[in-house]
């Protein structure tokens, strides 16, 4: 059986972590990495934790040079958060007759906010005989797919609360920017007001996935709240820094209503170095129904 040939598109914190993981696996060969700027022409091993050793070198190339028909079996797309931004890249890969796994948060359930693009991706994949999967720890598993699985033991479901208390420390600069790490409280509030601060991307997708799986029709658009987590001590992670008095995280909630009643609530406080201030991470699925479910996993599943 031939090894699965993989191209990684984007070698930031996420793509680099995927490379390190794949290099531990059997049956998989990384045959290319797509990057940009000064990274092009350099070795993948210059940007990841794994030493090259006696492995063949993998040079970072441009998308124009690397995206050829059937150049790999699958492309891991480790760029973007939003379906509209990921779509042009997905289209290029699919038209080269390669499968796609995307880590873009909205791609976990793209029909929630981009139904037309989701339909177009489905059409392109079928035309080219390949598949497109959007997934991740969250969204993609902890606050949605796991919730759906846990409802499988219920005769009836009345309401759902999914809570994830997690550390942002492993994430790269893009996530630090989206979450407002290191900015002042005034800057955070202004970013929330004018929509330039994204915070967690995925409530629409997670709530949409859970509602569709149960058979609930949302009676109103998903809403969310967003508050700064202000640190009283300096905190530093590999890609972020927040001095005392500034923003070290973002506490967000998402709400899904059915027939005017709150049925799905998501509670998601995230911050860098939570342990530094005594915050214990964890994942929680609380289902009110028959029977009730109270699933706790602490510390969090990292990711």
Predicted regions and their residues:
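Gly/Ser/Thr-rich loops at beta-strand to alpha-helix junctions
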Residues: 12-14, 82-83, 107-111, 137-143, ...
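Alpha-helical support elements that line or immediately flank enzyme active sites
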Residues: 141-152
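Aromatic/hydrophobic pocket-lining residues that form π-stacking "cages" and hydrophobic walls in ligand
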Residues: 89, 121, 207
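A short hydrophobic/small-residue beta-strand
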Residues: 99-101
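C-terminal helical cap and adjacent loop that interface with cofactors, partners, or active-site loops
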Residues: 272-303
